[in-house]
Amino acid sequence: MAATGEALTPQGYIQHHLTNLSVGEGFWTWHIDSLFFSVGLGVLFLWLFRSVGKKATTGVPGKLQCFVEMIVEFVDSSVKETFHGRNPVIAPLALTIFVWVFMMNFMDMVPVDWIPELAMAAGIPYMKVVPTTDLNITFSMAIGVFLLIIYYSIKVKGISGFVKELTLQPFNHKAMIPVNLLLETVTLIAKPISLALRLFGNLYAGELIFILIALMYGANWALSTLGVTLQLGWLIFHILVITLQAFIFMMLTIVYLSMAHEDH
């Protein structure tokens, strides 16, 4: 499959599947496919949970309601065990992060050629369907968490308290202020960077493995048979990966915001 309709080499096939549909150039490049799927899945999440919430009954719940309630209770218990402050925003935020990230990760379960082939038939040359394999998406979410950390740190501790936290820890001496400021600034900035890169790295690697396995289908029958076995095995294992990465992103967000609420 190729944008020009010609057969691709293995290298070209891999590159094609790792290329976003984009407009603009340089810093102002917009990845249309990542935005479409991330926003679309976010809207689907809101619609689904709102629909279940409106139809919730005290009687015998349906399967979908049971599933949603199970997710909500799991996230709520995770917040209660981890977050030590009082903030009604944290639980809904954690639920949104967990479900939204999981849904974006779950797009990696779709066979790698299905949606790109449909896009090609419609005249669209590139189509990446897993938003969390786009560093722009993972960094956008991580920066959002980072801004919340700064906001609640200042709201709870005040500007002076926040500045003291940056300048008087871990060494409580005026002479160590430059060292403290350097250490705390690096620690603070490392939080969104680690959030973004961890999610991106795991999902990008998972997608690349699916693409490499898909290449085997174009070889002889022996490699094609092996490819089916490998894809099934990796699919089962990857379900654990995508769930775990959504959980880790949620838990680290809760931990970071809990730390922001701690008034030293």
UniProtKB/Swiss-Prot annotation:
InterPro entries: ATP_syn_F0_a_bact/chloroplast (IPR045082), ATP_synth_F0_asu (IPR000568), ATP_synth_F0_asu_AS (IPR023011), F0_ATP_A_sf (IPR035908). Keywords: ATP synthesis, Cell inner membrane, Cell membrane, CF(0), Hydrogen ion transport, Ion transport, Membrane, Transmembrane, Transmembrane helix, Transport. It is found in: Cell inner membrane. CDD domains: ATP-synt_Fo_a_6. It comes from the Bacteria. It is a multi-pass membrane protein. The chain crosses the membrane at residues 29-49, 89-109, 134-154, 177-197, 208-228, 235-255. One of its GO terms (cellular component) is plasma membrane. The keyword Disulfide bond does not apply. Its main location: membrane. GO terms for biological process: proton motive force-driven plasma membrane ATP synthesis. GO terms for molecular function: proton-transporting ATP synthase activity, rotational mechanism. The keyword Cell cycle does not apply. F-type ATPases have 2 components, CF(1) - the catalytic core - and CF(0) - the membrane proton channel. CF(1) has five subunits: alpha(3), beta(3), gamma(1), delta(1), epsilon(1). CF(0) has three main subunits: a(1), b(2) and c(9-12). The alpha and beta chains form an alternating ring which encloses part of the gamma chain. CF(1) is attached to CF(0) by a central stalk formed by the gamma and epsilon chains, while a peripheral stalk is formed by the delta and b chains. Key component of the proton channel; it plays a direct role in the translocation of protons across the membrane. Belongs to the ATPase A chain family. This is ATP synthase subunit a. It comes from Shewanella woodyi (strain ATCC 51908 / MS32). The gene is atpB.
